[in-house]
């Protein structure tokens, strides 16, 4: 219950910009957030490996 309420609270637009919390749009995780993709590192890795994020591919050299 606490996690659900925190996710809903983070999605609301705050009165002041500094009160904004970055949370993953998919799972609600507050840590390891990637701003460019609006998701956490775990969801990013999962979706990138499945090829669901356009322009992102696994690097190899």
Swiss-Prot record:
GO biological process: translation
InterPro entries per record: Ribosomal_uS14, Ribosomal_uS14_bact, Ribosomal_uS14_CS, Ribosomal_uS14_sf
A cellular component term, taken from the record's GO annotations: small ribosomal subunit
Cofactor stoichiometry and binding remark: Binds 1 zinc ion per subunit.
Cofactor dependence: Zn(2+)
Keyword RNA-binding attached: yes
Residues annotated as binding Zn(2+): 24, 27, 40, 43
Keywords tagged on the record: Metal-binding, Ribonucleoprotein, Ribosomal protein, RNA-binding, rRNA-binding, Zinc
Alphabetized Pfam families for the sequence: Ribosomal_S14
Task of the protein: Binds 16S rRNA, required for the assembly of 30S particles and may also be responsible for determining the conformation of the 16S rRNA at the A site.
Subunit structure: Part of the 30S ribosomal subunit. Contacts proteins S3 and S10.
Family in the record: Belongs to the universal ribosomal protein uS14 family. Zinc-binding uS14 subfamily.
Name of the molecule in the record: Small ribosomal subunit protein uS14
């Amino acid at each position: 219950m606490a996690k659900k309420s925190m996710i809903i609270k983070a999605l609301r637009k705050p009165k002041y910009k500094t009160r904004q919390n970055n949370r993953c749009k998919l799972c609600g995780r507050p840590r390891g957030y990637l701003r460019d993709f609006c998701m956490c590192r775990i969801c990013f890795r999962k979706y990138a490996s499945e090829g669901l994020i356009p322009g992102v591919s696994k690097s190899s050299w």
